[in-house]
Structure formats: structure tokens, C-alpha cells
């Protein structure tokens, strides 16, 4: 396919136009009085949202050279969303400001590589200053404040604070759609996975259609169990111990299943068979988690354990197990607290090392099941469009809150960045590197300026007033007052603010050092078709 080549000013100009198109669309959503954007997504569905990354993902520009600029900023928003879960609009505004200032300086003859070094040094200095200013999220009220600011809804803040209160900082909080109006919070204690009983004969409570085993032994088996002869020696030992048995295996079938069912119906002893969750390596990992949680060993030929040779020592225990048609919950497994902590540390290390979002999500689910439990927030609304918008806001608020618990909070409303930019005063840079740092200093005021502009105030005036206020004070765009933001509960997670700045600077550094771009040449339309289309109707003058 033939390519189009653009060089120097033409190339950078096209990239800047692309950046501006995307950023101008996203930045109208910034702040408590930011507006929404209506998106026509694939299949002509309509989404209304004020979530920066959702808007950015939908934008593809017609001009291919400009589209490259837009895609670079989309990367800023997406990366910030992956790391911190919020702050995507702030990141986009920062990127736009740095691109605009940076390209102006490049056009005036500054050295792009020196600018990039200056930008990087400035970002590190501001980032360190933000961390130094951050304070821990201590109370449930502060957690509620973070979530309220992110979702712009106090009811959401209260529900999320309750959820974190129950599951702790490593717990999983999932957001699901509900058929009823409003918000509901449900809590699942213990380890739950989405596989139910293999046969309905195992049910112990016919009214609720579930099997409940108190103080059971738990057998974890990696393969299928189909031959009763392999199984019977272990079953006899369990019957003698007088406790029920939960069997988790790839499958239980044939004679083995019949043996369990017959004994259950006769009342000889109570058991439930469940298929292991996941498949392949993930199934192995989840069985390993259950083994640690219950104090069991996974029976598998790989580790030299055969079903017909093992005794009670390979079985795990739990206070109780509840199995429904669709899921199994193990409450208070008998594993040692130390082993569970080791396993949690191991999974945390894997989360830090992985590049794949999907893997990270699955690892975090496993971590939560071991560490705390799972809270489910159900959200409902009158229409599909409103439901989507609410769900977006809730997911963002959960991410922002988790970020706040991890690294702490700073004053919100764009003022923390502005105040932290005073860290650049002590940087001893010269020449174009100093110019690079001043680009970051100017950009650091932009989020505050747009929060003010979107609320109908004069942005530059607000910025110069806030600059003179003490750290932690700033502009409350909701009321138009200059006040102590932290005391008012207007706070941002420092991780969100830092990620926004770091990711914006990373892409801008690359964009400034661009000297040429190569894009596919659009296919020519046949001449006649174009003419007929354009001049089909001649109006009399």
C-alpha cells in the first residue's frame, strides 16, 4: 500500500491537531461542573458519559496524520486508567498543554531532546513533591470523600466506603447491573468460585436448593475421579472420622459419583462433589489457592500422590461449605495464617510483574478471595443509557478509592499539581532543559484552569489566586469559594495525579522528538462519483 510522508513542522503540526481534537472533546468533562459527551458507539448504541477514557477510546479521526496524534493521547488516557483507574481527563489536559508549549519551543529552535530531559526531570520533581505532601486515608469518611468526588455522588461514596470497610484494601469489589433502582451492596465472605454441585442429589436444604456441610473434610483432586475402587479406601477413613466431605476435582463421574450419591441417599455419610473452577494453568493455580486456604494437599500424580494411596492427611478443612447450583463458598478454611500470607505475597509479586490486563484482573480476583472476600455493588437505573453511565462512574470511583488507600491523598480540584510545581524552583537546569521544566510548570496549572472554566469562572484568575494560597487550600468549583479543600473532603488520590502527569509527559517527550510521520495513503475515489455527489443539485440564482 502506498504511504504518505510528512516531515518536520508539517508532521508535528498534524500530530498537534490530532491531540487538540481529542483533548478538546475530553476536557469539557473536567471538574464538578463538567459536561457530558454523547457517544454513538458501534451498532448505533448511544452512551452518555463524562469518563475521559471512554470518550477517548471512541475517537478515530478521518485525517490519518492527525489520527496519529489522537491515538498517542488515547494511549495516555488508557495507561492512566490501567494504573490508577481514574484521572484520565486530567492526563489528557496535561498532555495537550505540554504538546502545545513544547511544539512552540521546538518551532522556535529549541532542541527537542534537551526539552525532553527537562520535562522528565520536572515530572520526577513534582511527583516526589506530591508523594511528600500526601497523607494516608485514615477514616471511613475519607474513603467516602474520595469515592464521592470521583463519582460526583455522595450515595455512591457511602456505599463504596461500606464495601472497603468489609473487604479491606485487597478485597474484590465488583460492580454489577441490577434490575431494581438505586444501589445495593452484598458481601460474600470466604472463598467463592462459580461451580456448583455436580448432582442435585447432594442437596441438604431442599427449600433453598443448596448443600451445606458443617466442619467438612475437603479433597482437592487435579484430574477426573471415575473409578470407585480408587476412591473407596479414602471414603472409609472419612466415614470413620464421622465428618462430611467436599470433593473438588476436574470431574467426578461413573462409579465414583454413584458411590457418593448412594451413600448420601442412604444417610451413611454426607458429601458434595464439585467441578474445579477455571481450566489449564488457572485451574492449577486456583486449586493451589484452595489448598493453602484449607490446609489441604492437591492430589495429583505430578506430585506423587495417588487417590487410592492417600489418607486423611491430604484433606483440608473448613468451618462450613455452602454449595448452590451455580457456586461454592468455603468459609473459614483451616489453612495456617502464615501460609496464606506467603501465598498472598506471591500473588502480589505476580501482579507487579504481569503486563497483561486480563492476567492482572484474574490475579487480583485470586488475591481478594484469599485476603478478604468479595463485595458486589449492584446498580440500577431507569434506562439502559443511564445505567451504563452510572456503572462507569461507579467503576471509576472504586478504582480511585483503591488508589487512595495505596498511596494516600492530596488536595483535589487541580490545586495539588499547581502547588507541587513549586518543586521546580530548586531544579538547577539551564538552556533548553530549563525550558522543558517551564513547559511542565505551565501544564501543571491547566487541570485547575479547566475545572474553573467549566464551572463558568475565569481560569487564569483562579490559577493565580490559588498559587498564593497555602498547600491543601484551593478553589471549590462547586461553590466558587477559595477554601481548605482537604477539610471539605475535596481530595484526589495521589496515585491518580502522579500517573496522569507521568503518562502525559512520557508520550509528549516522544511526540516532541518526532521529525517525520508515515501513514497509509487513502484510496482515491473514482472522479465521477465524487462530482455527481457534490454537484447533483444546481439551484437557480
Curated annotation (Swiss-Prot):
EC number, as in UniProt: 5.6.1.7
Main location as per UniProt: cytoplasm
Compartment(s): Cytoplasm
Gene3D superfamilies xref list: GroEL (3.50.7.10), GroEL-like equatorial domain (1.10.560.10), TCP-1-like chaperonin intermediate domain (3.30.260.10)
GO annotation (BP), single: protein refolding
Record-annotated disulphide pairs: none
Coiled-coil zones: none
UniProt entry keywords in alphabetical sequence: ATP-binding, Chaperone, Cytoplasm, Isomerase, Nucleotide-binding
GO molecular function: ATP binding; ATP-dependent protein folding chaperone; isomerase activity; unfolded protein binding
Catalytic activity as recorded in UniProt: ATP + H2O + a folded polypeptide = ADP + phosphate + an unfolded polypeptide
Entry binding sites for ATP: 29-32, 86-90, 413, 492
CDD domains: GroEL (cd03344)
Stored InterPro entries: Chaperonin_Cpn60_CS, Cpn60/GroEL, Cpn60/GroEL/TCP-1, GroEL-like_apical_dom_sf, GROEL-like_equatorial_sf, TCP-1-like_intermed_sf
Any one Gene Ontology cellular component term annotated for this protein: cytoplasm
Family: Belongs to the chaperonin (HSP60) family.
Assembly information from the UniProt record: Forms a cylinder of 14 subunits composed of two heptameric rings stacked back-to-back. Interacts with the co-chaperonin GroES.
Function in brief: Together with its co-chaperonin GroES, plays an essential role in assisting protein folding. The GroEL-GroES system forms a nano-cage that allows encapsulation of the non-native substrate proteins and provides a physical environment optimized to promote and accelerate protein folding.
Protein name: Chaperonin GroEL 2
Gene that specifies this protein: groEL2
Amino acid at each position: 500500500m502506498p504511504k504518505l510522508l510528512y516531515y518536520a513542522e508539517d508532521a508535528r503540526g498534524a500530530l498537534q491537531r490530532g491531540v487538540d481534537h481529542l483533548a478538546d472533546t475530553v476536557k469539557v468533562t473536567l471538574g464538578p461542573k463538567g459536561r457530558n459527551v454523547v457517544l454513538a458507539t458501534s451498532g448505533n448504541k448511544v452512551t452518555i458519559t463524562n469518563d475521559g477514557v471512554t470518550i477517548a477510546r471512541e475517537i478515530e479521526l478521518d485525517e490519518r496524520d492527525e489520527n496519529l496524534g489522537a491515538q498517542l493521547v488515547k494511549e495516555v488516557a488508557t495507561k492512566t486508567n490501567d494504573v490508577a483507574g481514574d484521572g484520565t481527563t486530567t492526563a489528557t489536559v496535561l498532555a495537550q498543554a505540554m504538546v502545545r508549549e513544547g511544539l512552540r519551543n521546538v518551532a522556535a529552535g529549541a532542541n527537542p531532546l534537551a526539552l525532553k530531559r527537562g520535562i522528565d526531570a520536572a515530572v520526577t520533581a513534582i511527583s516526589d513533591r506530591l508523594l511528600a505532601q500526601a497523607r494516608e486515608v485514615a477514616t471511613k469518611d475519607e474513603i467516602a470523600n474520595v469515592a464521592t468526588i470521583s463519582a460526583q455522588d455522595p450515595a455512591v461514596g457511602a456505599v463504596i466506603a461500606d464495601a472497603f470497610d468489609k473487604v479491606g484494601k485487597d478485597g474484590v469489589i465488583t460492580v454489577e447491573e441490577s434490575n431494581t433502582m438505586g444501589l445495593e451492596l452484598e458481601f460474600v465472605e470466604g472463598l467463592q468460585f462459580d461451580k456448583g454441585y455436580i448432582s442435585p442429589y447432594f442437596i441438604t436444604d431442599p427449600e433453598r436448593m443448596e448443600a451445606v456441610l458443617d466442619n467438612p473434610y475437603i479433597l482437592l483432586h487435579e484430574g477426573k475421579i471415575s473409578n470407585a475402587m480408587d476412591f473407596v479406601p479414602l471414603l472409609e477413613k472419612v466415614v470413620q472420622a464421622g465428618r462430611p466431605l467436599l470433593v473438588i476435582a476436574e470431574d467426578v463421574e461413573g462409579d465414583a459419583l454413584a458411590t457418593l450419591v448412594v451413600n448420601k441417599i442412604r444417610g451413611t455419610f454426607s458429601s458434595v462433589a464439585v467441578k474445579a473452577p477455571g481450566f489449564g494453568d488457572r485451574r492449577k493455580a486456583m486449586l493451589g489457592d484452595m489448598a493453602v486456604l484449607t490446609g489441604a494437599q492437591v492430589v495429583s500424580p505430578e506430585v506423587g500422590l495417588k487417590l487410592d494411596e492417600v489418607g486423611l492427611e491430604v484433606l483440608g478443612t473448613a468451618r462450613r461449605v455452602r454449595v448452590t447450583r451455580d457456586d461454592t463458598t468455603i468459609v473459614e478454611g483451616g489453612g495456617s495464617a502464615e501460609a496464606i500470607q506467603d501465598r498472598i505475597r506471591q500473588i502480589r509479586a505476580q501482579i507487579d510483574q504481569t503486563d497483561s490486563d486480563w492476567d492482572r484482573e484474574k490475579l487480583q480476583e485470586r488475591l481478594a478471595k484469599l485476603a478478604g472476600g468479595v463485595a458486589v455493588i449492584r446498580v440500577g437505573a431507569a434506562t439502559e443509557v443511564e445505567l451504563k453511565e452510572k456503572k462507569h462512574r461507579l467503576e471509576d470511583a472504586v478504582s480511585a478509592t483503591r488508589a487512595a488507600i495505596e498511596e494516600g491523598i492530596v488536595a483535589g480540584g487541580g490545586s495539588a499539581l499547581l502547588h507541587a510545581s513549586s518543586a521546580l524552583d530548586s531544579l538547577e537546569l539551564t538552556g533548553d532543559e530549563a525550558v522543558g521544566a517551564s513547559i511542565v510548570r505551565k501544564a501543571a496549572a491547566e487541570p485547575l484552569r479547566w475545572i474553573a472554566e467549566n464551572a463558568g469562572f475565569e481560569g487564569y484568575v483562579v490559577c493565580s489566586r490559588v498559587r498564593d494560597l497555602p498547600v491543601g487550600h484551593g478553589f471549590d468549583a462547586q461553590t466558587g469559594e477559595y477554601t481548605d479543600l482537604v477539610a471539605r473532603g475535596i481530595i484526589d488520590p495521589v496515585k491518580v495525579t502522579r500517573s496522569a502527569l507521568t503518562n502525559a509527559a512520557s508520550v509528549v517527550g516522544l511526540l516532541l522528538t518526532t521529525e517525520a510521520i508515515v501513514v497509509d495513503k487513502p484510496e482515491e475515489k473514482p472522479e465521477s462519483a465524487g462530482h455527481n455527489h457534490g454537484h447533483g443539485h444546481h439551484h437557480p440564482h
